[in-house]
């Protein structure tokens, strides 16, 4: 049975929480240019645009390799400050690069 199923957190006594941005994914230049310059403030619209191109992020492979090893012992729960609007793209990215197609446990802002 896959540890990525919806009851995984009930089958294992400990949970490892893994942040996404800057931990297992690196924002690309295509994404970073959407943010306003420092000191200019950021509107929700800016963050929505930024988060909606999260599927272009580059995987940080050495960290992902460690996270995959953690799956053997622990329930792994991903967290992010991304807006809810990017949930589907975030889940798709995790399935593609981290969970080998299985549905990830995910909490978003």
Q: What feature does the model see in each segment?
A:
Residues 1-6:
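Short, basic/aromatic recognition patches
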Residues 7-109:
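Alpha-helical substrate-recognition element adjacent to the catalytic core
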């Amino acid at each position: 049975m896959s540890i990525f199923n919806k009851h995984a957190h009930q089958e294992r006594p400990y949970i490892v929480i893994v942040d996404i941005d800057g931990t297992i994914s690196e924002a690309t230049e295509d994404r970073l240019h959407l943010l306003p310059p420092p000191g200019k403030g950021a509107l929700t619209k800016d963050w929505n645009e930024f988060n909606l191109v999260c599927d272009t992020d580059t995987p940080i492979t050495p960290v992902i390799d460690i996270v995959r090893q953690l799956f053997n012992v622990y329930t792994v729960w991903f967290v992010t400050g991304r807006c809810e609007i990017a949930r589907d793209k975030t889940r798709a990215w995790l399935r593609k690069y981290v969970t080998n197609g299985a549905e990830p446990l995910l909490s978003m802002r």
